[in-house]
Amino acid sequence: MLSCRLQCALAALSIVLALGGVTGAPSDPRLRQFLQKSLAAAAGKQELAKYFLAELLSEPNQTEIDALEPEDLSQAAEQDEMRLELQRSANSNPAMAPRERKAGCKNFFWKTFTSC
C-alpha cells in the first residue's frame, strides 16, 4: 500500500515538474507523448481508487448525526448501512473468491482442483 502511494506521489510530482518545464519551453511532440502515457498509466490505478473510496467512506459523520432530529436518526442509520454496503463492495475482490466444489468431487491431484 505504501509503495502504491509512493509511486502515485512520484508520478504526480513528475507530471507537475514536466508541466512547469513545458510552460517556458517550445512545444515538443515527444514530451506530449510522455505526458499522455504517464497520465494514462496513473488513470489505471484501481487499487488507489478503492483506497481513496474506503478512506472517504470511513470518515466519521458525527457532527451530522448530532445535528439531526430524532426522526432523522432512522435516515442516518440507513445511510450508515449504505456506507457499510459500499465498503464491503469496495473491499470484495471477485478474483479472490474461493473455489466451489460440487458434492462428490475429490482432489486426486495435490496441486490443482479437479473439474467435475
Swiss-Prot record:
Gene field: SST
GO annotation, cellular component aspect: extracellular space
First-listed, main subcellular location of the protein, grouped into a coarse class: secreted
UniProt xrefs under InterPro entries: Somatostatin (IPR004250), Somatostatin/Cortistatin_C (IPR018142)
Assigned keywords, A-Z: Amidation, Cleavage on pair of basic residues, Disulfide bond, Hormone, Secreted, Signal
Keyword Phosphoprotein: no
Biological process terms in GO annotation: regulation of cell migration
Disulfide pairings: C105-C116
Localization in the cell: Secreted
One Gene Ontology molecular-function label: hormone activity
Origin species: Bos taurus
Post-translational modifications reported in the UniProt record: C-terminal amidation of the neuronostatin peptide is required for its biological activity, including for the regulation of mean arterial pressure.
Similarity-based family: Belongs to the somatostatin family.
Protein name (Swiss-Prot/TrEMBL): Somatostatin
Signal peptide, first to last residue: 1-24
Lineage: Eukaryota, Metazoa, Chordata, Craniata, Vertebrata
Residue positions, PTM Alanine amide: A43
Propeptide segments, given as residue ranges: 25-88
